[in-house]
A protein has these predicted regions:
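Acidic, low-complexity intrinsically disordered regions
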Residues: 1-232
Length: 232
């Protein structure tokens, strides 16, 4: 577990981050592709982007108290690892992501859905208001687990029920945007080159705006033109 990241997972244990800080929360899940194809410059740029996210959120007094981050890496065969459990942005330390193995994307999405419901139960138990959770899935390939379609259906159903907002981000020339689109009614988008820093800067600004919105209201997000590839 990375220093500065919360390792608490049992909802029966009092969570000091919620009793000490009773601010409304915006839960944000980052699902990070750590497969072998991300090795080299892609994973280096992604790690630099995570550091940008950490630094920018900590500069914002309100967002640093309200945005909660969960970082999950998927790689190996069916290896899904929580790199950073639910942590307020003020205490978030960007994890160092390494690259190896395959792309068990479905397994990561299933874990994210479970942990989101657990965290919402914590919020309710502590009287904490929260905005609709955000889930960001970043990949340069396609799912390699056999039952990924079931996870995609679960994600789409949760989104349609208003339980989350899902963003699919594809990087590199080998990403399968068609399969990524199965996880959400929102169309996935393509990263320009390796502009992970620009992506995470946009994410920090977007979550900052959303964290200040009243519960249940819509938020105008900044344009993603700095990092999103526009189809010809």
């Amino acid at each position: 577990m990375i220093a500065g990241c919360n390792s608490m997972s049992n909802i029966d244990i009092p969570d000091l981050t919620l009793t000490d800080n009773t601010s409304q929360r915006l839960p944000c899940v980052l699902l990070i592709d750590g497969s072998g194809s991300m090795s080299g410059q892609p994973i280096d740029e992604l790690n630099a982007g995570l550091k940008v996210l950490e630094d920018e959120l900590k500069k914002d007094d309100i967002a640093s108290q309200r945005v909660q981050l969960l970082v999950i890496k998927f790689s190996g065969d069916r290896d899904v690892e929580v790199l950073c459990d639910w942590t307020d942005a003020m205490s978030f330390s960007a994890p160092h992501v390494t690259a190896n193995g395959l792309t068990p994307m479905g397994e990561a999405v299933r874990l994210a859905l479970v942990k989101l419901e657990e965290q919402k139960a914590r919020y309710r138990a502590n009287g904490i208001a929260y905005n609709r959770p955000w889930v960001f899935l970043i990949t340069d390939g396609q799912p390699t687990d056999d039952d990924w379609e079931q996870a995609a259906d679960q994600s789409r159903s949760a989104e349609q029920a208003g339980k989350l907002i899902f963003f699919g981000i594809g990087a590199g020339g080998d990403v399968d945007l068609g399969k990524l689109a199965r996880f959400s009614s929102r169309q996935p988008v393509k990263l320009q080159g390796l502009k992970f820093k620009e992506l995470f800067l946009w994410l920090s600004r977007s979550t900052s705006s959303a964290s200040k919105a009243a519960q249940g209201t819509n938020v105008q997000l900044p344009p993603p033109s700095d990092w999103m590839q526009v189809s010809a």
